[in-house]
Amino acid sequence: MSEQSRCPVTGRTADSPATGSGLSNRDWWPNQLHLDMLHQHSSLVNPMGEGFRYKEEFGKLDLKEVKKDLYALMTDSQEWWPADYGHYGGLFIRMAWHSAGTYRTSDGRGGGGTGNQRFAPLNSWPDNANLDKARRLLWPIKQKYGKKISWADLMILAGNCALESMGFKTFGFGGGRVDIWEPEEDIYWGKEVEWLGNKRYSGERDLENPLAAVQMGLIYVNPEGPDGKPDPVAAGRDIRETFARMAMNDEETVALVAGGHTFGKCHGVGDPKLVGPEPEAADIEEQGLGWKSGYGIGKGDETMTSGLEGAWTPDPIHWDMGYLGMLFRYEWELTKSPAGAWQWKPKDVAEEDLAPAAHDPSKRVPTMMTTADLAMRMDPIYGPISQRYYEHPDQFADAFARAWFKLTHRDMGPHSRYLGAEVPAEELIWQDPVPALDHDLIDAEEIAELKKRLLASGLSIPELVSTAWASASTFRGSDKRGGANGARIRLAPQKDWEVNQPEQLQRVLHKLEEIRNTFNGEQSGNKQVSLADMIVLGGCAAVEEAAGKAGTGVTVPFTPGRTDALQEQTDTESFSVLEPLADGFRNYMKKKYSVSAEEMLVDRSQLLTLTAPEMTVLLGGLRVLGANFQQSPHGVFTTQPETLTNDYFVNLLDMGTEWKPLSKEQDTFEGRDRKTGEPRWTATRVDLIFGSNSRLRAIAEVYGSDDAQEKFVHDFVAAWDKVMNLDRFDLG
């Protein structure tokens, strides 16, 4: 081969594969534990730098000016992608809705909080067709305000401004969404390998957890009906399941569908085969835009998007009762769009109920409804709600405003995280409110005194540790729910969860309450300590005591300031999704699952925002502290229980132990002395993965070394402190 064909630096030829190409480890070993999800979104991929503080930058933003620019954009139709009816409102509502609408309650993942619609796979989902144009239309505004407003905030704000510019009064807007710079590794979107696949169902029509959408690449349901079959009643069942998994009840669902479909139109005037590839598959010269259509001019009245065609209302750019009016005033007959999609047309429609053509106001065209829309009338539950909204427009407007606000803010956590002048004063129950701090905080001397009382109370180290862990470890970094603040572990439903060992929990809480009441009664002035703080402080005191027993003196950080929520501030149904199906840190599995215990451990660790080293040191420490569910001996690799030693790692890595499964499911194991055959330990998959997985074993070796005891304790304390404070947004 000629030297001209070789790279002068690497010596590679023109036929050599690119660096980083070829099979990955996961290609070779598909069942390999997916630890990469614990190390996402690092400073290495973030161009903003480690010192960037979005909250500070957003505080410099003139929100009124941004909104003024967004209002102007709504009617500034661009030749490269002209606005339907001269107004981009419908497009931006869809963009904001589809940004927020990926949220699901089961794991809190998805939603509009990260700006992930910019990246694959979402930027190329079939349901997001042509939303790439919406984001490009926003670019001049993003460019103008730069780091002061994130893409995530701008997309939601654009949806609000679209509604307001068409005459609707929104409930408010809270900023504070921080952009990510790479696609998430932790979100499971489904097992399908083709767009619109639906292998997510089993049985009659049981949708796989944690999924909410009915098909791969859809945000909600198939608008043509289940699996494309135009059955409005069956569609209603799909809609109810899907919206419930996205935190919406029946009234909110009707309000969102009817309110959102008051605006804009669907696009399906030609052959869908003429539509080009999605953004991630498009040619480089398309510069990140996809779905280039070969039908006509490919835009305007010849746009292809969903395959459905037409507006829902006669006036698609103004807030009115047009959607519900059309839904109830007409009978509907099944038809197909020009693109071949099932939809419905009104029978004997009056002239005044025709809509203008989107790009030629001199023409009048029929409106349409999708099968999903007709479910709002024909479903036995949705129908009466729709009728009530139709008869009470003010009630409908309020319901839509509140449901839209919930849709676009559900994944942001508590009210205290919202930024900006348009944050509503009203706290809503789905924001998991906690009372405002109304007392003076305990100081270092009083903290030390309370620790003494806790350790002298008769409560054991395992009881104090496991109670604090149970309270704090409900936190989910995905939607910022859960955590120790509020002491909701004493309320329904958490007090009754099996994993929390209710009988033991009540005994521990009673003793903590007793110590708290005695202390508070001794105070003069306004100084108090909350039960939420007592729960965490008890765990901290126990960790300190256990470290001292191991000969490693340490002070576990503790910051008071938590308050105690009331039962009426706690939506029991909403909180039920926080119940752990498995908690590897306590060696707990509610039942057998198709997903392995070690995978569930990594998933839980990711929700707790833990890295692999933090996960490792926490689990090893909690084992020797005796925090296992029902005091199980599995994984307690120590002869000095309740002592914070690195024994877990020393004994796990001991080649003198040979492990054998105790069950055909290979979920529990026994370790015997390799020479004598004498039993030494028992363990679960969650324990043995730290010796089996090469990456986790490498970390375990750090903590199992002869010189590692002090590092182990300090790393455990740091990780413990992190978990105890995950929901302390007041600490910055």
Swiss-Prot record:
This is Catalase-peroxidase. GO terms for molecular function: catalase activity; heme binding; metal ion binding. Its EC number is 1.11.1.21. Keywords: Heme, Hydrogen peroxide, Iron, Metal-binding, Oxidoreductase, Peroxidase. Heme b binds at H261. GO terms for biological process: cellular response to hydrogen peroxide; hydrogen peroxide catabolic process. InterPro entries: Catalase_peroxidase, Haem_peroxidase, Haem_peroxidase_sf, Peroxidases_AS, Peroxidases_heam-ligand_BS. Pfam families: peroxidase. The active site is at H98 (proton acceptor). SUPFAM superfamilies: Heme-dependent peroxidases.
